[in-house]
């Protein structure tokens, strides 16, 4: 399936000078800037009968309010959240594999406490807005070589 990384879109807009924000800007500001663009990309894919995976943290939890029902029937949303217990016990594993998908230049700001706060807030917002989520509570194994 084709995919769109909202983070790649963000960095392209920032590096090209077409975005007044920076990578360090507040997530709420980045979401407010990026979501209208991403929303219209999603609509275009649906109208063209194309499948598209859109991934990233800049999708608002009230995303449904951005679409008419004819679009909503074509959208599958899922949020991945770690439980507090999982993060407390397996933070070292998360750090060890942080660069598997993309090479991160500086992850020093990523702390166990920060991830716990973010995941707790994401879970709360999923529940508030009735968004589907997967709560990762137990160790799991994904064989990356088989993908």
Region roles according to the model:
Residues 1, 71-76, 129-131:
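Short glycine-/polar-rich loops that comprise or flank the Walker A/P-loop
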Residues 8-11, 59-60, 81-88, 140-141:
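Conserved nucleotide-binding/hydrolysis micro-motifs of P-loop NTPases
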Residues 19-23, 70-73, 95-97:
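Short, hinge-like loop/turn segments at secondary-structure boundaries
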Residues 57-78:
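Short, electropositive alpha-helical surface patch
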